[in-house]
Regions:
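C-terminal regulatory/oligomerization modules of transcriptional regulators
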Residues: 1-8, 81-83
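Short, surface-exposed secondary-structure edge patches
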Residues: 3, 25-32
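Short alpha-helix capping/helix-loop boundary micro-motifs
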Residues: 23-27, 47-48
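C-terminal structural segments of small proteins and small subunits
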Residues: 46, 50-83
Length: 83
């Protein structure tokens, strides 16, 4: 699953990045995305579902949907998602 597929108000753990997007991966890492970090989708835009806003390490970050599609995530359990 990738971050752009994560439902609103769901939490996940970053598992890695799609291969073949090295420049984008570097940029995402520079703004704080890293394996093992918790991420939560807060809002999805109205038009073309852009942008996506997420909470990452206490910060709120807006991403283009195509950029979020490079970030691989794993869902946290339902208990952790009720917070």
């Amino acid at each position: 699953m990738t971050l752009d597929q994560l439902e609103r108000k769901r939490k996940a753990i970053i598992k890695g990045f799609d291969e073949g997007h090295s420049e984008l991966e570097i940029r995402l890492r520079e703004i704080g995305f890293a394996e093992g970090d918790s991420v939560e989708t807060l809002h999805v835009g109205l038009f073309d579902k852009n942008p996506i806003s997420v909470r990452l390490n206490g910060a709120i970050i807006a991403l283009r949907r195509k950029d979020a599609s490079v970030i691989k995530v794993g869902l946290l359990s339902d208990v952790e998602n009720k917070d």
